[in-house]
């Protein structure tokens, strides 16, 4: 569909209004008069905010983009990265053909990259897959995917691995950012994802940020919070962090605490609520139940590590029946005096924060991102903030609630909702539940027993298995884990380069990961393919393909579906399975999984006239619609309802559950959520008893703390101008010039004590590796004494040479925020 910007906006204005009101109306296919630039709607490629954009194309290239003024999320605004979206696609080193390490025309793990055909690449891959399966079984092959993949790419990966290969070794890079949040949602409410939405911002009286620099990481949402704060003098903003950053500029209360003591701070708040009779007993008695967590649960390190000795690591996720009295006893030791000493916050700061949550007249929204999630007790801190909101009843109502912000455009839609984790299936189903496996097998038309009950390997376990030779093939898609993941030198790189292992990286650019792989597959980007993302407020948004990918680059979806043709059921399935469905004998996995009468049932005629759609044209049917409608069957009628496919192309996103054409803004609350019956008031229907869990857990120390040799805390993160590993943003000249290289931020007195000055070339070292960088004592980030901060966007400075691969033992998410380092002047 080619529209001028004016006609596009006119055609969608009524739809935007109708969608906001929960209505649906038909939209005609308006074809604009010839215009130099043709416009269509899209979704920003960066963070999890889900900003809508208008994409302008000319002569087969994206030449312009702007914020969509009719979009509810961003209201016409973009951040600095969003304004340069077109340029992410046109870096000079864009990959356009498959590249395989070769010597004399044959694969050689130590050879140089040489161009090959797609067929040669896939035949080589298939050979390596089959060798690995034969050597080490179904779990010898792994997929590390992405919260940047489109919804149907994530769904196809899940289906190929869990149904086709009968292996649950699929993990997304959301493991590094959202796993703790997802696990805590499931443990607390029996369902994943936030109950509120961005509309809370305009109705809240107070905002509390826990480990979240929204000013730089979610700037569009921060602009809405800023507007709310400036236009309402009684609104308050509190920011808690281990160092000062740009979000402190708006804060009424800026609190810098000692790393890991957020656990103690929240237990103090709970103690304050109890001691000051600030518990909403009516809410608590009707809608909650009490549990206590297993303690001394270890740090997700290798079993032989000293920190794993004599721990309850094997039962880390267990929750025991408990009571309010037991919670009261546990938190009683977290007095204001003790927590002040532990955290470094003064008593007034702590009491002011506790009073904010305790005040029944104040609507409070708590936001957090990686400061909570990338934490060796990330699940606990997530559940502790839920405790506070549940104990006060400040949840599931406009302007009140706990809200986990995502960092990737579809960490929710693709990683979590699709179930791209090694223990999950779509719509919060899990592989360990036989009834859930039966649902998947029914929808996917598979023999009973096809989906394995064995939980696959998470990414840190994949790294270790590759290093140990127990997993032999890894396919990495749409991420740069060799730069983004922890402990590069000791685990990941040795495993990737180990003789006998084979690594495939699908990427549009020659990243650190790609250059460490054996085979590089060139991928289509952003609007070079039809796509869908799910943002942090449960909003599912679609866009159409608007330009073609360069050269031989293909979408990840095409790669997955085409690769499925290189395997047959006879090779991958047991005789017991084939005997149940003999009609599947000899068929390719492509035929069984994708050309199955469901995915392929929508003809090409359902595409908009003149609409690009390379995958559908290649396979001969409307691939995306078929995949989506099959996927949506998992959640409809179960609180995860998605609208019909065609609705999303007409709207600017819809927040699930979408029931009878109406989206849901606040879940679990009568009058807002169609799954809450009249008279229930609140129903946390993820659990059969419709009650949420309040969990009693203590403070436990981090895996590594500063000592005499490594005397500083290291925290890693991002800056406004760059996104993750900089694969896209460093190829935008304007963004690169604005922030060309990584820095290490340090307190001026810490620098002085080491004989260092602002701008010095330094060496920062940990027990795992080192990095050469430059010192900043005057910039936007202002660490307290004893802590340094750095970023990971710079491929020339691999910050994750330093980080420890300690994880939360429950969520398996890495703690990138706390390890011990030393800093000295570089030679």
From Swiss-Prot:
Q: Boundaries of each 4Fe-4S Mo/W bis-MGD-type domain copy?
A: 37-93
**GO molecular function annotations of the record:** 4 iron, 4 sulfur cluster binding; electron transfer activity; iron ion binding; molybdenum ion binding; molybdopterin cofactor binding; nitrate reductase (cytochrome) activity
Is NAD found in the keyword set? no
Q: Which UniProt keywords apply?
A: 4Fe-4S, Electron transport, Iron, Iron-sulfur, Metal-binding, Molybdenum, Nitrate assimilation, Oxidoreductase, Periplasm, Signal, Transport
Return the SUPFAM superfamilies for the record.
Answer: ADC-like (SSF50692), Formate dehydrogenase/DMSO reductase, domains 1-3 (SSF53706)
EC number(s) from the headed UniProt entry: 1.9.6.1
Q: Where the protein is mainly located, per its record?
A: periplasm
Q: Where does Mo-bis(molybdopterin guanine dinucleotide) bind?
A: 81, 148, 173, 177, 210-217, 241-245, 260-262, 370, 374, 480, 506-507, 529, 556, 716-725, 800, 817
The answer to whether keyword Membrane applies is no
Described by its record, this protein's role is as follows: Catalytic subunit of the periplasmic nitrate reductase complex NapAB. Receives electrons from NapB and catalyzes the reduction of nitrate to nitrite.
Which NCBIfam families is this protein grouped with? NAPA (TIGR01706), PRK13532.1 (NF010055), TAT_signal_seq (TIGR01409)
Query: What protein is this chain from?
Result: Periplasmic nitrate reductase
Give the organism's phylogenetic lineage: Bacteria, Pseudomonadati, Pseudomonadota, Gammaproteobacteria, Pasteurellales
Q: Which gene encodes it?
A: napA
């Amino acid at each position: 569909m080619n529209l001028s910007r004016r006609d596009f906006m006119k055609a969608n204005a009524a739809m935007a209004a109708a969608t906001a009101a929960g209505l649906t109306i038909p939209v005609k296919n308006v074809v604009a008069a010839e215009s130099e630039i043709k416009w269509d709607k899209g979704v920003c490629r960066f963070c999890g905010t889900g900003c809508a954009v208008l994409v302008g194309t000319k002569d087969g290239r994206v030449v312009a983009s702007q914020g969509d003024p009719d979009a509810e999320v961003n209201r016409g605004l973009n951040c600095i990265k969003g304004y340069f979206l077109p340029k992410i696609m046109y870096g000079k080193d864009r990959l356009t053909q498959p590249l395989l390490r070769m010597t004399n025309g044959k694969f050689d793990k130590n050879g140089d990259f040489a161009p090959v055909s797609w067929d040669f690449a896939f035949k080589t891959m298939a050979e390596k897959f089959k060798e690995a399966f034969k050597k080490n079984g179904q779990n010898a092959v792994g997929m590390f995917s992405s919260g940047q993949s489109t919804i149907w790419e994530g769904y196809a990966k899940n289906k190929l691995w869990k149904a086709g290969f009968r292996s649950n070794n699929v993990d997304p890079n959301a493991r590094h950012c959202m796993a703790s949040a997802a696990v805590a949602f499931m443990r607390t409410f029996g369902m994943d994802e936030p109950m509120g939405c961005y509309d809370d911002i305009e109705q809240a009286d107070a905002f509390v940020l826990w480990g979240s620099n929204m000013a730089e990481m979610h700037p569009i949402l921060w602009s809405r919070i800023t507007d709310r704060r400036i236009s309402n003098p009684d609104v308050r903003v509190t920011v808690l962090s281990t160092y000062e950053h740009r979000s402190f500029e708006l804060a009424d209360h800026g609190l810098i605490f000692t790393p890991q003591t957020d656990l103690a701070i929240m237990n103090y708040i709970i103690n304050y609520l109890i001691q000051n009779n600030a518990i909403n007993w009516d809410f608590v008695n009707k809608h909650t139940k009490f549990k206590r967590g297993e303690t001394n649960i270890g740090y997700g390190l290798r079993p032989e590590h000293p920190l794993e000795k004599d721990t309850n690591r094997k039962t880390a996720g267990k929750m025991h029946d408990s009571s309010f009295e037991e919670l009261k006893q546990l938190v009683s030791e977290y007095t204001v005096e003790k927590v002040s000493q532990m955290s470094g916050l003064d008593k007034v700061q702590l009491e002011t924060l506790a009073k904010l949550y305790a005040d029944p007249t104040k609507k409070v929204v708590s936001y957090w991102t990686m400061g909570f999630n990338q934490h060796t007790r990330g699940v606990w801190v997530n559940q502790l903030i839920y405790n506070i909101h549940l104990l006060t009843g400040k949840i599931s109502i406009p302007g009140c609630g706990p809200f986990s912000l995502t960092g990737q455009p579809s960490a929710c839609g693709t990683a979590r909702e699709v179930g791209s984790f090694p223990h999950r299936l779509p719509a919060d189903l899990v592989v360990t539940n036989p009834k859930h496996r039966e649902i998947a097998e029914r929808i996917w038309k598979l023999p009973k027993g096809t989906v394995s009950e064995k939980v696959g390997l998470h990414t840190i376990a994949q790294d270790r298995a590759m290093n140990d030779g127990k997993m032999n093939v890894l396919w990495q898609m749409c991420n740069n884990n060799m730069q983004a993941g922890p402990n590069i030198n000791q685990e990941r790189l040795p495993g990737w380069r180990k003789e006998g292992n084979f690594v495939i990286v699908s990427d549009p650019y020659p990243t650190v990961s790609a250059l460490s792989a054996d085979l590089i597959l060139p991928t289509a980007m952003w609007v070079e393919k039809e796509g869908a993302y799910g943002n942090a407020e449960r909003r599912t948004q679609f866009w159409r393909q608007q330009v073609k990918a360069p050269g031989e680059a293909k979408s990840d979806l095409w790669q997955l579906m085409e690769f499925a043709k290189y395997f047959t059921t006879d090779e991958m399935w047991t005789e017991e399975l084939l005997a149940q469905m003999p009609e599947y004998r000899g068929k390719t996995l492509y035929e069984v999984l994708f050309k199955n009468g469901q995915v392929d049932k929508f003809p090409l005629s359902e595409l908009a006239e003149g609409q690009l759609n390379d995958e559908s044209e290649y396979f001969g049917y409307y691939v995306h619609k078929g995949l989506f409608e099959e996927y949506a069957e998992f959640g409809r009628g179960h609180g995860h309802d998605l609208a019909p496919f065609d609705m999303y192309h007409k709207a600017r996103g819809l927040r699930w559950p979408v029931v009878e054409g109406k989206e849901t803004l606040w879940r679990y609350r009568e009058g807002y959520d169609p799954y809450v019956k009249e008279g229930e008031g609140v129903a946390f229907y993820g659990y059969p008893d419709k009650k949420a869990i309040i969990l009693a857990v203590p403070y436990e120390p981090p895996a590594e703390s500063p000592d005499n040799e490594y005397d500083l805390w290291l925290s890693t993160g991002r800056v406004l101008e760059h996104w993750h590993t900089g694969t896209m943003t460093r190829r935008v000249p304007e963004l690169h010039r604005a922030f060309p290289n990584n820095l290490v931020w340090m307190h001026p007195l810490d620098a002085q004590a080491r004989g260092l000055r602002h701008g010095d070339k330094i060496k920062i070292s940990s027990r795992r590796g080192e990095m050469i960088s430059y010192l900043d004592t005057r910039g936007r980030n202002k660490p307290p004494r004893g802590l340094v901060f750095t970023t990971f966007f710079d491929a020339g400075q691999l910050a994750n040479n330093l980080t420890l691969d300690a994880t939360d033992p429950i969520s398996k998410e890495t703690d990138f925020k706390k390890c011990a380092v030393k800093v000295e002047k570089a030679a």
